[in-house]
A protein has these predicted regions:
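N-terminal cap/leader regions of alpha/beta-hydrolase-fold enzymes
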Residues: 1-272
Length: 272
């Protein structure tokens, strides 16, 4: 039984806790593993036990995983009350662009700097970036950093008020498309078919921007875990988090297959 199944916080004792400075902005990052670097960004409402479970799976597959603290309480079990407060704070934060018309979230510049540092420390052909929910699209924006060569966009939820939006300014969108085309990058993405926070309209917008470079995979909502933590049950209220809160850890399950596909994608690009 993991921490989420037990309703417990995760103490994160198997990661080193670092204070990482990017252009004078300092944030906490949890780091563990050996091998090429992968930046794994948390979903709302923070670095939950399920996010850490995914981080450990990536680490144990032969990567150095970097988990930046961007919002919420690190390691906290996601309750409905606390999660709603984290969402409210993030939506008015200057670091994020939660609503349509806001363009690219400024925090992605810091995350690109983290990717540069990870590549410098770990070497290899480049770095992977996994975004989840609120940070889902950040993995795509991070391809503006040359070291990021393996972006995974999981159930991106921003902008919250535009189901066909991409949380990208026009200039950044053009630059991302050019980078993807120039370097032959494939963008791997996942969502549930009945997710109201990441709809088919959003995936269609990615396809319009990126063409065949966008590999969007859709799982049936009926495959989602039926007893997720309270924040996902009471606030999210829909199948959403394919490889974290709504993952079913059973051999052969579609969500576990998605996890394995992500790890295989990272390995093919970062272990060469």
């Amino acid at each position: 039984m993991n921490a989420t199944e037990a309703g417990l916080d995760d103490s994160i004792t198997d990661f080193s806790r670092r204070r990482v400075d990017v252009d004078g902005v300092v944030k906490t990052v949890y780091v563990s593993g050996d091998g090429p670097g992968v930046v794994l960004m948390p979903e709302m409402p923070g670095i939950s036990p399920d996010v850490l479970r995914l981080a450990r799976w990536v680490r144990d597959a032969g990567f150095t995983v970097y988990v930046p603290s961007l919002f919420g309480a690190d390691g906290a079990y996601p309750t409905a009350e606390n999660g709603q407060e984290v969402v409210r704070r993030a939506c008015v934060s200057a670091e994020f662009r939660a609503f349509a018309g806001g363009g690219t979230s400024p925090v992605t510049a810091w995350l690109r700097g983290l990717a540069r540092q990870a590549h410098g420390e770990c070497g290899g052909p480049g770095v992977g970036a996994i975004g989840l929910c609120f940070t889902g699209n950040f993995a795509l924006t991070m391809t503006l950093e040359p070291s990021v060569i393996a972006p995974v966009v999981n159930h991106p939820s921003l902008p919250l008020d535009d189901p066909a939006g991409l949380e990208l300014g026009d200039e950044d969108a053009r630059a991302v498309r050019e980078r993807v085309e120039r370097d032959g990058i494939t963008v791997l993405a996942y969502r549930f078919d009945n997710d109201r926070w990441c709809t088919g309209q959003r995936f269609a917008a990615y396809r319009k921007l990126l063409g065949d470079a966008f590999d969007g995979r859709v799982l049936p909502g009926g495959a989602a875990r039926t007893d997720p933590p309270p924040f996902f049950r009471d606030v999210v209220q829909t199948p959403h988090s394919v490889t974290t809160a709504h993952l079913v850890d059973e051999d052969g399950h579609p969500t576990l297959k998605a996890r394995d596909e992500i790890i295989a994608y990272l390995a093919a690009r970062l272990h060469s």
